[in-house]
Amino acid sequence: MTDLLASTLEHLETLVSFDTRNPPRAIAAEGGIFDYLRAQLPGFQVEVIDHGDGAVSLYAVRGTPKYLFNVHLDTVPDSPHWSADPHVMRRTEDRVIGLGVCDIKGAAAALVAAANAGDGDAAFLFSSDEEANDPRCIAAFLARGLPYDAVLVAEPTMSEAVLAHRGISSVLMRFAGRAGHASGKQDPAASALHQAMRWGGKALDHVESLAHARFGGLTGLRFNIGRVDGGIKANMIAPAAELRFGFRPLPSMDVDGLLATFAGFADPAAAHFEETFRGPSLPSGDIARAEERRLAARDVADALDLPIGNAVDFWTEASLFSAGGYTALVYGPGDIAQAHTADEFVTLAQLQRYVESVNRIINGSH
């Protein structure tokens, strides 16, 4: 085991021990994980800001770096299926297991290890609100307009540079009907649940019509009706129904246009339609601008000797940096298939590969 990997594992064990589950959005700026990170970054100018509701950012700079590394420190809640305490990291022959080791405290530990392996220029932005779908930390950073050639956002990409991914939009719909006995002939709009079912059929047909759309190796529109609530009992016409759905567009797709199309499948007089969250695609912008930004990110990956991976379906905050005008890519250790799972793990080989690469970027010739 190399010294870099040993140092990474030491820091990772400590980072895992801090409870940063989100929700409940209870991560504090003082004490805990942020005090630990501050203490591990001697020689850095460190700024910790509490943005409220568990959103805390730590911005650390040494020298005049060209690149910013961004890592979120919050994790999803643990499930009942963990076989041991999720906040006690376990080591096996080829991996470590613990809540957040893959998504994505392993990257944070590696960056701290690399920072302490030399005195090269470096900039880190650690945040605690990525899992909350309320990106206050990134929004506050973008408002400052600090100059960087590129931002490398850590998420599990098998230590390959990801240049493109889907956006995400979440929508709440409410349908209004008229209560009554189910034995009689119904007006088609009487049942709120029937309205929701008809809307779902039209929406699914539209999604199928987009199956052949492509961008950067991605195909089609990802769409999911995640929840439908409503009605009282089988012999009563449902007076109200609520439906929640989400979709993940290609970078080349017009999100506002898609929302208008989905909204148009319902009677506006009987349905409420509200987008509750939107994350842009990576790269952001129209087709021409997105392709220009993708090529710029590819040039950065090539300059840093990072292997380039395929575009991915999952969303990351790299898209927020892209929308804010930065060249951005996603790069981190581990497999996304392990994120959010019981007994989450990352392999030692992945941590080794990542820490060596960021050490080279920080302390090498880049």
Curated annotation (Swiss-Prot):
- Its top-level enzyme class, in one word, is hydrolase
Q: Where is the active site?
A: E130 (proton donor/acceptor)
Q: Does the keyword Metal-binding apply?
A: yes
**In what pathway does it function?**
Amino-acid biosynthesis; L-arginine biosynthesis
MF terms per GO, please? acetylornithine deacetylase activity; cobalt ion binding; N-acetylcitrulline deacetylase activity
Annotated cofactor note: Binds 1 Co(2+) ion per subunit.
Per UniProt, the keywords (alphabetical) are: Amino-acid biosynthesis, Arginine biosynthesis, Cobalt, Hydrolase, Metal-binding
Which cofactor names does the annotation list? Co(2+)
Which reactions is this enzyme annotated as catalysing? N(2)-acetyl-L-citrulline + H2O = L-citrulline + acetate; N(2)-acetyl-L-ornithine + H2O = L-ornithine + acetate
Which Pfam families does UniProt cross-reference here? M20_dimer (PF07687), Peptidase_M20 (PF01546)
Record note on quaternary structure: Forms homodimers in the crystal, but higher order oligomers may form in solution.
Domain topic, free-text comment: Consists of two domains, a catalytic domain (formed by residues 1-166 and 286-365 from the N and C termini, respectively) and a dimerization domain (residues 167-285).
Entries under PANTHER family matching the protein: ACETYLORNITHINE DEACETYLASE, N-ACETYL-L-CITRULLINE DEACETYLASE
Q: What is the recorded name of this protein?
A: N-acetyl-L-citrulline deacetylase
What gene is it encoded by?
argE'
